[in-house]
Amino acid sequence: MVGATKSKRMHARNAAAVAAAGALAVGIVSIPAAPAHAADTITATDQAYFGYYGLDRARAKGYTGKGVTIAMIDGKVDTSVPELAGANITVKIPCTITTSPSVESHGTGVASILVSADYGVAPKVSLLAYQGRFGGNGDRGASDCDQPGGVGKDSQPWLLNSAMNDGAQIINLSASTPNEYKELKWVTARAIAQQVILVNAAGNDSTNDDDTSLSKWSGVVGVSAIGVDDNRQNYSSWGQGVVTASIGGPFSFHDLASGEVTQGSGTSFSTPVVTGVLALAKQRWPEATSNQLLQLLVKTGLNPDHGWNQYTGFGAIDPGAILNTDPSQFPDENPLMEKQGGSSPTLEEVQQYADGVVDPTDIVNDNSYTYRGLDESMLEDSLNVYPTHLGTSPRYHRK
């Protein structure tokens, strides 16, 4: 985790351990380093990814992400830091969460990679910044976070659906995931059906982190980390969910506890780079579907012949190729539906969601869902909070 404690690495594995004990715990995935300097100003020259990807040239051509809405689920974003001055950020606090400066530093840093006027990848996007609860890093939620059924307002399923409810087109999650949530399957099914792109950090355990990664699910863009030497970073985790890679640091950000500018590296920071580039692609290719943009990401990856491996996916991201290759030539099909070794939701499960026949008690905070199945007990189930129209699913009327 990035934060005030520079000598201690917070592992994403903390998430699995605490979540298994019945608490929401999401390990924030980045690695701290020593303080860089105490100056207030952070510039593009301080950020390894900015020059590496030639983002000044993208800006010169007008590619800023204008008109695109990104959401992030992370620590609370402090919009008062100088690097976020003028950025279009709406901070969303779902309930009362007791947190720490280190978690807020992480969220604020991730936001700055996305939208900083000085060094943001997509400085003109509209950013919805949702505060989550990261129990593995000491966060605690108050009773107003609780919901019937046990999936609270501070949980990932709830917040991912909040972002889609609010119109997010791309969602950044620089954190690991307690995958015991069965609701995550239907969150990702919704994202696939509605063509919302989910982007997730692979982790920093230098191991196969599928068990604590949202990116193990179909449709999700898992991001590992490379260095400016183009090599995969030793800390970067891997697995079937990895789709691409980008520069993971060193990244300069404000430590909100000390006020100093510090540095860190990790897939927490490689992930918003990918999210930002996808926002640039949405602006550059407004007629393309999100499925076609994912096809573009896969087909421009820098692995030889765009082949897949568990370390860098289809290869490191190539923003230049993405902004210069028309995705309309690619099929309007999600290329991440069946990940290596199999993944869920399947196409049939996505169709079940779209047809409204998924058990509504397995779905949380989804303002687009209507149950259209045949189970009459749903009419009386107190946990079913969705409109219910029995027998009206399109699957019952297709010829």
Outline where the language-model segments fall.
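Structural recognition of the beta-strand scaffold that forms the well-ordered cores
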Residues: 69-73, 126-131, 164, 169-174, ...
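Subtilisin-like serine protease catalytic core
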Residues: 59-70, 76-89, 98-150, 218, ...
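Solvent-exposed loop/turn segments at secondary-structure junctions
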Residues: 75-79, 95-98, 119, 133-137, ...
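N-terminal domain-start motif of subtilase-like serine proteases
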Residues: 42-70, 93-99, 318
